[in-house]
Amino acid sequence: MYIIKRANSSARGFTLTELLVALVINVLVLSSLLAIFIANLNHYTTAINTNRLNQQLQSAMQLMTSDIRRAGYWANAKTSISTDTNSNPFMATGTDVSVGGTGNNCILFTYDKNSNGTLPSISTTADDERYGYRLMNGALQTRPWGASFSCTAAAASWENVTDPTITLTALTFTERTQTVTTGLGTSSLTTRSIDISMTGELTSNTAITKTLTEHVRIRNDKFNP
């Protein structure tokens, strides 16, 4: 005699429909997790790139401000003023602070770096105490020893300061002056300052951009006898 037992319903397993529903749910969960991961990764990458751009621009700005601040320094300035003259070779025509270039994107200046009181001839073998910064082809450039002391110097004759990973889109120098009397006859002092505005972007992502501004007070006032 055959005995037929009813199969336990709990041992039947999942139906095809139930498996498909479970699979869809798993796919949706994994897709959500993947989307969150990608969003976090993009945010992290953007933060790193923004920080990189900021560091590059800050370094470039600090280099310019610390250098421009010294413009016109002359070791013998006290002696010149005591004789009511201004024979400062670092404030003469052609060596004094000068802003030029396209849209005032270039600055030239000199200072007595070695404090020997004289401005040397242009030389490629030693610091000739002539300095400059400008925007050229998306990069900040500085004038090296022996190069043309001109805002229109060939691009290859000056050196790039900024890294190729960033592109400068704007650089402007604005000179501001104020003349005050000294109370000694007709002599006066001219105070000078330079306002710098610089904008840059990531070369690989032009949507990431930043603008820095700085006010630089030139420490060496110009004596007008």
Regions of interest found by a model, annotated:
Residues 39, 46-49, 58, 78-79, ...:
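Short capping/connector residues at structural and topological boundaries
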Residues 45, 68-109:
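Short, glycine/small-hydrophobic-rich surface segments
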Residues 67, 71, 143, 219:
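Phosphate/oxyanion-binding loops and surfaces in catalytic or ligand/nucleic-acid-binding neighborhoods
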Residues 3-5, 150-225:
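Short linear sequence signals and composition-biased patches located at protein termini or domain-edge surfaces
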Residues 2, 12-75:
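Aliphatic-rich helix starts adjacent to a transmembrane/signal segment
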Residues 89-181:
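Type IV pilin-like appendage domain
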